Amino acid sequence: MRILLVEDSKPLRRENEGALQRAGYEVICAEDGESALEMAQGGHPDLILLDMILPKMTGPEVLRHLKSDARTKDIPVVVLSSLSEKNRQKLMEEGADDYLEKGALMPMRGLNLLPQALENVICRINRKRGIPFSNIPVHR
C-alpha cells in the first residue's frame, strides 16, 4: 500500500515515515499543501495522511481540491490533527474518510503508534466502502 504523508514538521514527518516503512508501507512525503496536490495527482497513492496546518495551502483547502478532482476524489484521506469535534465533523462532511488524533500518536518510549492506528482506520474505511474483511490490505 502506497501512502502519501503530508506533514510540514520535518522531525515528525521523518519519524512517521520511518514507522510506516518499518510496518511495510511504501511512503511518499509532501511538506506543504501545493506539493501534496502534485504528489496526489502524480504519485498514485492508495491513501493520504493529511496534516491540517500546512504552508502554501491549508489542510482543508487541500482536502477540497482532492475531493473535487476526478484524479484524486476516490483516494481515502485521513486527517492528522488535534482539532475540535466540530471542526473534525466539518472535515468529514467535506470528504475526509477518517481522523487520527495527532497527540495520541506521539512516540512513547520509542514506539510510534501510527502504523497500528492506520490499520484500524483502513479497516473502518473499507467497511464503509463495502470491501469484504478478507480483502483489507493490512501490512504487518
Question: Which ranges hold each PLM region?
Answer:
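Acidic, metal-coordinating helix/loop segments flanking the phosphotransfer/catalytic sites
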Residues: 29-47
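CheY-like receiver
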Residues: 107, 111, 120-140
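Two-component/phosphorelay signaling modules centered on CheY-like receiver
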Residues: 10-28
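Conserved acidic carboxylate
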Residues: 7
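The feature encodes the CheY-like receiver
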Residues: 55, 73
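Active-site residues of response regulator receiver
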Residues: 51
